[in-house]
Amino acid sequence: MSAQPVDIQIFGRSLRVNCPPEQQDALNMAAEDLNQRLQDLKVRTRVTNTEQLVFIAALNVCHELAQERLKTRDYASNMEQRIRMLQQTIEQALLEQGRISERQDAQFE
């Protein structure tokens, strides 16, 4: 489906952006999140320049994204390591099971 124009409000300004209909709710939630971030920054920093607030918010979001990427990378690496350990454990168990089966077969001959 093609993108449709959607009007959103960010920090008192109207913006019209193109958005696929199935992502419109996510866009509205993102706009609400950005509005809240900007409002919180304005109160916390006492900065009144909207452009400066937007840049600070953008830097904060980029930093959060970088942190989440690192956590995801660390998690994936940890899972890969655990999978390798499980594979080794399973392979070892299968080898031992094979040895036990060979001994049992030899006893019956």
UniProtKB/Swiss-Prot annotation:
It is found in: Cytoplasm. Homodimer. Interacts with FtsZ. Belongs to the ZapA family. Type 1 subfamily. Activator of cell division through the inhibition of FtsZ GTPase activity, therefore promoting FtsZ assembly into bundles of protofilaments necessary for the formation of the division Z ring. It is recruited early at mid-cell but it is not essential for cell division. This is Cell division protein ZapA. InterPro entries: Cell_div_ZapA-like, Cell_div_ZapA-like_sf, Cell_div_ZapA_eubact, Cell_div_ZapA_N. PANTHER family: CELL DIVISION PROTEIN ZAPA. Residues 22-99 form a coiled coil. It comes from the Bacteria.
